[in-house]
Amino acid sequence: MLDPSLLRSSPETVAAGLARRHFTLDVAALNALDQQRKALQIQLEQLRNARNEASRQIGQARRQGLDTGAMQAAAASNGEEIKTLEQSLERTLAEWDTLTIGLPNIPQDSVPDGRDEADNVVLRHWGSPSTFAFPPRDHVELGEALGIIDFAAGARLAGTRFVVLRGAGARLERALTQFMLDLHTTEHGYTEIAPPFLANADSLYGTGQLPKFEEDLFALRDDPYYLIPTAEVPLTNLLRGEIVASLPQRFCAYTPCFRREAGAYGRDTRGMIRQHQFDKVELVQIVRPEDSAQAHETLTAHAEKVLQLLELPYRVTALCAGDLGFSAAKTYDLEVWLPGQNQYREISSCSNFESFQARRLQLRYRAEDGKPQLVHTLNGSGLAVGRTLVALLENHQQADGRIRIPAALRPYLGGMTVIQA
C-alpha cells in the first residue's frame, strides 16, 4: 500500500512514478475524493462542536429550571445531520480505499525504464551456457527415460500441470530442498520456519496477493482459507501488527506452492516449468529502511550461491519498471540456463518492497527517537526446487542419459555421483 499522506500531498509525484510502470493514476478522481473527505470532516467537526455546546447549554438550563424542549429538538436534528454526514464520510473513505488499494508500488529510481520483459537489463553472467558433444535432451525426455518423472500419473491423479516424481527423482527433490535449507540456515543466517500451507485473507492482503490477484489463488470451498501461492505469505506475516524489537529478521521456509496460473493458458505446457503445485525454498528479510538496499543485494547473493554450488550457469537481470510485480519497488531475476530449451529461464525473483507490504501489515520498529516506523520487507526464492531439478538434469546430463550429481549435493544423496536407469 502506498503512503496515503504522499497520495494526498503529492499525487502528481505518485502519478509520475506509476507512469514508469505504464500505469495511469486518476489524479483528478483522487483529488476530488480527498477534497470531499476534507469538507465532510470540517462539517462534522463543526456539528460535533455545536452538539457539545448545545449539551452544555441544555444542562445549564435544566439546572436553572428552564424549559429545554426547543433546545432538545434542535439537538436531535443536529444528531441526525451528524449521522448522515458520518455515513457520507464512510462512503467517501471506502471509495478512496477502492481507488488506492489497487495502486502498485512506485519503482525505485535505479529501476530501468521499459514496458515488459523484453526491456529487462542483464547485469551479469555466472558460468557459460553448457555445451555438449551430443544433442542435449530436455528434462522431460531425460526424466522419462530414467523412470524418475511421470507426467501421465500426475495427469491421472490430478490433471494437467501436475507431475509425479519417482525413486531417484523424488529423492533428488528432497535432497535439493535439504541442501538449500542447510545452506541458508547455517551459512546465511536465516531462521527456518515450518509454516501452515493455508492462509487467511488478512495474510494474503498483507503481502499484496489480495484483492488484486484472487483469481490466481486456490480457495477452499467451505472455509475462509486459501492454499499459499508462496511461503512469502506466511513468512512476511509472522510479525504482522507487531513493533519488532530487533532487526534484521531473516526467515526461510520450504513449502509446496499452489497457483491456478489463470493467465498462463498455452504457456509452458510441456514439462515441469509451470505447475499448479511446486516446491520452493523462500527467503524473507525484514530490515530498517536505511538497510534495505544492501539487504536486497545480500539476499540476491544468497540465492545465487545455490546455483553456484550446483554448478548451474545463470544470469542476473534487473526488471524494468513495466515488468515489476505489483508490490515490488525493485526486482532482480535469476535466470538459469536450460540446454533443453536453449535459453535462460527464471528460477528466482528477489524483490525489495520497501514499506509497501509493511504498511498493509502494520509491521513496525522503534526508530532512535522512540517512535514506531514502518520496516522494509524483502523476499526471494532460494530456490524454486522443481526448476532447480529441471536445470540440474539438463545441465549435468551425459551422453548415455545418466545425470552427474554436483559435489555439493552428493552428501544429501548418500554419496551418489550419478543418477542412472
From Swiss-Prot:
Pathway(s): Aminoacyl-tRNA biosynthesis; selenocysteinyl-tRNA(Sec) biosynthesis; L-seryl-tRNA(Sec) from L-serine and tRNA(Sec): step 1/1
Gene3D superfamilies given in the database record: Bira Bifunctional Protein, Domain 2, Serine-tRNA synthetase, tRNA binding domain
EC number(s) on file: 6.1.1.11
Signal sequence region: none
Keywords associated with the record: Aminoacyl-tRNA synthetase, ATP-binding, Cytoplasm, Ligase, Nucleotide-binding, Protein biosynthesis
Main localisation: cytoplasm
Uppermost EC category: ligase
A GO cellular component annotation in the UniProt record: cytoplasm
Binding annotation for L-serine: T230, A231, E232, E282, S381
Entry binding sites for ATP: R259, R260, E261, E346, I347, S348, S349
Protein's cellular compartments: Cytoplasm
A Pfam family hit: tRNA-synt_2b
Family note: Belongs to the class-II aminoacyl-tRNA synthetase family. Type-1 seryl-tRNA synthetase subfamily.
Record's comment describing the protein's domains: Consists of two distinct domains, a catalytic core and a N-terminal extension that is involved in tRNA binding.
Name of this chain's protein: Serine--tRNA ligase
